[in-house]
Structure formats: C-alpha cells, structure tokens
Amino acid sequence: MNVAGLIVGLGNPGKEYERTRHNLGFMAVDALMEAAARETGGGCDQLSGGKKKYDLWRCRITPTGDPWLVAKPQTFMNLSGEAVLAIASYYRIKPDAILVVHDELDIPLGRMKFKTGGGNAGHNGLKSITQLLGTPDFHRLRLGIGRSPHGGETTNWVLGRLSGPEQTLLDTLLPAAVQAMTIFASQGAAAATQFANAYKPD
C-alpha cells in the first residue's frame, strides 16, 4: 500500500484523559479526519482499531497524491515511541515523512509552531519517539497550552481540563492546526512552518 507518510497525534487513551491539555494531539488529528471526510470526498478508512499500541487510519487529506496514515497511540504518552516505531517499520515510513502533533508548554494557548528535529523540551512523548526511532529528525506541530499562571506541578496542569475561555481559544486553534497539517501534506515542511509560525488567533 502506497502512503505519503504518517501523521501522529499524541495523547493518553481513556475517558479520564479526554479534553485534557495533554491530549491536544488527539484532538487535532480528530479534527483533521473530520475535515478530510468533508473536503476531499474520500475521508478516512480505519486500518486498526482497538490494538494494544495504536489506532490507525488511512486518510485522503489532499485531493491528489497518495493517502496519509493518521495514528493515535494507545500506549500512554511516555511510550508513544512504541506505536510510532511499529507503524513506521511495518509501512516503511522514514522519519522525514513523519509529523508528530503534540501539546507544548512553552507556547501560549491559541498559538502553534512547526519545526523539524531539535530537542524534546521535556515532553515525554517526543522523548520516547526520538529514542525508538533513533533520531530526532521528524517533524513536529507544537500546539500551545502555556504554563499554569499559578505555578505548581506541571503534571497537574497538563492533565487538567481546559477552562471555558481556554476552550474558546482551542476552538479557534484546531481549524488552523488542520490547515497546517494539510499544508504539510500538500506542500511540505517549509510551507507548513511559514503558516504555523505566523498564525495568531483573532
């Protein structure tokens, strides 16, 4: 099966983690798949559901060209690399054709940044993927969650749910994140970087 690459949304499985800050990656790829169903006519076909390590879809993200794989690891965040490595190995996808979508403490909520390679900024999902792929040279779409205005323990913040005003910002960010992923799929990393890094909420 020919595929253009792999887009991975990071998060934690289970209802207790739904709509938490750490699950922005899951929310973003869900929005991407909804957009694919609306706009390309092809939508997404589920290839693997309920597997131990991941849920996987084949999606027609752009009207032309090969479809993309879209994945949501089911391993919990700290073991995300196990899912990414399993998919990349089976489908023979190289790191430069992988985009990981994740939450980012160092970017304010409502903003996003696209980058290729680099460090993990303390993100355990990225750390796991880097270790198991053996390289940091994959693409990342970093969705801002900001840091707690009250300080305190980071774990409680990232696993907390969004407030009403935060949800409003997220509702604006997700369509823009979908656009960034679509630009990456159709035009490449440079164009996606230009769009994502210039994006500001209204």
Swiss-Prot record:
Site (Discriminates between blocked and unblocked aminoacyl-tRNA): 12
Reaction equations catalysed: an N-acyl-L-alpha-aminoacyl-tRNA + H2O = an N-acyl-L-amino acid + a tRNA + H(+)
GO BP annotation list: protein quality control for misfolded or incompletely synthesized proteins; rescue of stalled ribosome
Sequence positions that bind tRNA: 17, 76, 78, 124
EC number(s) recorded for this UniProt protein: 3.1.1.29
PROSITE patterns per record: PEPT_TRNA_HYDROL_1, PEPT_TRNA_HYDROL_2
Subcellular location field: Cytoplasm
Catalytic EC class: hydrolase
Main location: cytoplasm
One MF annotation (Gene Ontology) recorded for this entry: peptidyl-tRNA hydrolase activity
GO cellular component: cytoplasm
Active site, UniProt feature: 22 (proton acceptor)
Keyword set, alphabetical order: Cytoplasm, Hydrolase, RNA-binding, tRNA-binding
The keyword Iron is assigned to this record: no
UniProt-annotated site: Stabilizes the basic form of H active site to accept a proton, residues: 103
PANTHER family (UniProt xref): PEPTIDYL-TRNA HYDROLASE
Family to which the UniProt record says this protein belongs: Belongs to the PTH family.
Record HAMAP family: Pept_tRNA_hydro_bact (MF_00083)
Subunit and partners: Monomer.
Purpose: Hydrolyzes ribosome-free peptidyl-tRNAs (with 1 or more amino acids incorporated), which drop off the ribosome during protein synthesis, or as a result of ribosome stalling. Catalyzes the release of premature peptidyl moieties from peptidyl-tRNA molecules trapped in stalled 50S ribosomal subunits, and thus maintains levels of free tRNAs and 50S ribosomes.
Record's protein name: Peptidyl-tRNA hydrolase
Gene (name only): pth
